[in-house]
Amino acid sequence: MKRILSITLGLILLLGFSSCEKWLDVNVDPDNPNDLSATPEIRLPWIQHYYMYAWGTANMRTSTIAGIMTQTTSATGGNSRLAAWNPIQGSSTTIYQNWFLGGAVNLKPLIDRATEQGAYHYIGAAYCIRAMGFMMMLDLYGEMPYTEALTGKYNPAYDQGDVIYDGCLADLETAIENFSKTQEPGATALSEGDTWNGGDVNKWLRLCYGLKARYLLQISKKSTFDPAAVLAALQNAPQSNADNIIMKHYNVEGDAINFTVLDPYQTNTTWDAAAYGTGQRFTRWYANLLTNNFTGGSGVTDPRLPKLLPAVMTNVELNSSGNIINYEWKRDIGVDMMNSDIRMNGGPLNYAYANSRQTFKYKIADEAARTAFIAAVPHPYTVSADTVIVTYPRGAFYVNSTNYMRAGDTAYVNMRSNSMSTSGVSVTDMYYYLNADVKAVGGTGSFFARPDSDSEILSYAEMCFIKAEVYLRQGNAPQAHAAYIAGIQASFDRMQTKLNEWKSSGTINPDQMPMDDADIAAYLASAAVVQSASNLTMADIIQQKIIAMGINMQVWNDMRRFNYSAGNIGSFGVVYRDYKRPKEFTATNIIPGTSPTELNYWFRRFNHSTHESNYNNEQLLLSNPLAMKDPIWSDPVWWDKP
């Protein structure tokens, strides 16, 4: 990828816009590339990149809606308001923008140039990514210009979800057809422009069939849902972790910047959205999946937990020069979005490192609250009437606020990892330092959201959990259980592979080191994993699928398919145990349902972006009776309706 992006970097600005124009087929200057001179191997990596940026942003924003992640401040910014289920239109723009302006606009020119030379594998890649991009648009926005999109029409009509869905499946078939062909002599090899699979056509075919299985499962609410068709597609989807579709990413110094959003090009796109800054936190509900602390849970801690939930230094000891000589790690506990009013009281706030002694006076009028606060204070304190005076020694981690309710916000570790573009120390040291001079670590990062984390576009583990769900729907518990166990094992194996890569690279971060094999074996044999096929539930399958998928928009897609925690899909009962709407939720004008069994009780889709409402508003308003009205956010997209 690094080589491909370096070669083509200087072309991207021109290509993204010249593909919208009609150019004369004469006097093409190779030193000044345009729509005609942009060959397939130059276009493809940029289509892949901009699709991935849209996908990474969607991963973060949908994971926030799904209650996997939240933000540090009260509901003000667009993404923070997603956590409160009180969204604004601004959250709808980046995904749309990067897919259409960076990626989709280049698909037809790529197909045209590839057709001229018989480069069938590039045609296959274009149709596969077209299916992925427009399915993402359907998943998020519902109705969308599709058949008239990218045709040059200034006001393309909208298509309904079934048209987009059928078109995406048809595009996958076209992709499979082209990948199955032998390229014409002299055609550019796919390996020269493919940043996902390195030109491995068999992996592209695995991707197409895996996507087909995913999409066929996605209509599980529809009368046309065909479990046998899902299983048939899975036969040609990834069969092991060796078949995983992964985009590698790199933490490099001097990386060029994405022109649409000003983020580094080569870093992980989910990191760009979720862990570039200090505002993101995991939630308690997600943490409880890893500790199995939910209704009916075993209480067994998952060995993947320290790889997924970040940690911060605590109990720091300094020498006379102020350098850290000893410390312990404190693991993130997750922000309880469903049961606590923490964000309604201004939290959680970011923490700081005490370069010198800091003293704070906390006025606590309520005696019980004051007593509880004193019992929890780990630092020297005095009490004067209703005021507790706490002294934070040099080297302590503290919250710069006199609000006593915020003093404990150090328990919520932010997700940030530093890259070489964001104050990073080295390509292998991605700690978030509060003070880099003394190496005061404010966060160890998370497996799926570091600058050089792999993007798992489609994984064998996901295929296993799809298979487990389908077999359970068919009443075949033994096969469902076998697939469930295989999915858990695949998740561990995949993580171990990446963790060993990080270890070999020279990282010093313990959260990037491999897990202990004995811990994995003990977990797999524990009550945290269903040991008998007869006891397997859909909730068990989905819990493990969430953990394996990480920060991924498919988590929200699945959540909608099962109506969140309504418990009214088939005989599966409550699939998302202990799940609730955010405690701070008040936006009944947007999500007006009053009962969990009502579809509009839950967050169901995104409103359209300003690109559509500003420039194609007439067609937008014709697309849905709720278009551009508040309740559109709770209107199910096509596949989410029975």
Where are these regions (language model features)?
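Long, intrinsically disordered, low-complexity segments
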Residues: D200-V201, R214, A274-Q280, A287-V300, ...
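Membrane-proximal, proline-rich intrinsically disordered regions
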Residues: C20-T73, N86, L231, N323-E328, ...
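Short, compositionally biased low-complexity segments
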Residues: C20-L24, A75-R81, L138-P145, S504-D519
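Sec-dependent signal peptide recognition
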Residues: R3-G10
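Bacterial Sec-type N-terminal signal peptides, specifically the leucine/valine-rich hydrophobic h-region
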Residues: L14-F17
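Structured, solvent-exposed acidic/aromatic patches
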Residues: A38, T72-I466, V470-L499, S534-L536
